């Protein structure tokens, strides 16, 4: 795996947090998902991932469209050469790292991605997450990792028969992700 490590600036964290506070009206309203603060932090994690991917596309001089949605619906995260890229972001605890984690996809989100003609899914991990509190520690969150990508339709090959949580209908091991450099060559 040829992951890319990217430092996370305070400005990026602040921009992502402001976005999360706007998005809370439209996301993570499922019963039992946790406190309002925990839900904001889940959106914050996703927003950091999107901004990190945007930064990496810019650094690689790849032209793209970006939808940093704060309304009810979004059509895509990124579009490059008319190909839609979805970005999934998960937090990890520094002491445990991210290598044991997987790309998870919920059934309803996967079906929506197929309807919207998603081409690729990129997995990003950020440090500083506390799994017990389900909160991101701003002071410990300083690095993101673009772990790789998968062609979106291939996610269906990873149906998770041992589903334990909301959102783990599909479970893609990191070893099955392609290096992000390969995606960039195809753009």
Protein language model regions, located:
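Nucleic-acid endonuclease domains
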Residues: 1-81, 88-187
């Amino acid at each position: 795996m040829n992951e890319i490590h990217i430092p996370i600036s305070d400005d990026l964290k602040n921009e992502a947090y402001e976005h999360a506070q706007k998005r809370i009206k439209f996301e993570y309203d499922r019963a039992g998902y946790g406190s309002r603060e925990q839900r904001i932090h889940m959106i914050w994690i996703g927003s950091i991932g999107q901004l990190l991917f945007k930064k990496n596309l810019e650094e690689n001089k790849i032209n793209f469209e970006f939808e940093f949605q704060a309304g009810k619906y979004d059509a895509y995260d990124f579009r490059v050469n008319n190909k839609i890229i979805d970005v999934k972001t998960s937090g990890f605890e520094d002491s445990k790292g991210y290598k044991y984690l997987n790309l998870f996809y919920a059934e309803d989100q996967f079906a929506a991605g197929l309807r919207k003609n998603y081409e690729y899914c990129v997995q990003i991990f950020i440090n500083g997450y506390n799994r017990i509190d389900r909160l991101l520690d701003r002071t410990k969150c300083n690095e993101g990792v673009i772990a790789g990508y998968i062609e979106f339709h291939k996610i269906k090959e990873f149906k998770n028969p041992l589903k334990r949580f909301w959102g783990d209908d599909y479970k893609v091991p990191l070893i099955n992700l392609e290096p992000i450099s390969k995606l960039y060559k195809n753009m």
